[in-house]
Amino acid sequence: MPLTFLLIARLPDGGAEAFDAYEDAVLPLLAEYGGRLERRVRSLDDGTEVHLVGFPGEQEFEAYRNDPRRAEHAHLLERSGAAVELLPVRDLTSRNPPSGR
């Protein structure tokens, strides 16, 4: 069953550069596990970044999370000081289609 996650990263002042370095290292790995970065946005003050990420299933998601290459770059995430929250979500677009604005 496909999974979708919302990642919310709260970045302290000066943390964006290290967070970007971490993301540059780990986001390319998504494709190896069938994962997709559907959206990546950041607040204008660089204090919050949000990702919408999809995986074909739980097995692929867990394999991505346990990839040792992610652990190799964990020091960058720690150095960024980011507080990260990962929420499983579901799509409600069909209930309220975009208005076309």
Kindly label every feature range from the protein language model.
Residues 1-68, 87-101:
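Short S/T/G/P-rich N-terminal loop/turn motif that feeds into the first structured element of a domain
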Residues 61, 69-80, 84:
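C-terminal structural segments of small proteins and small subunits
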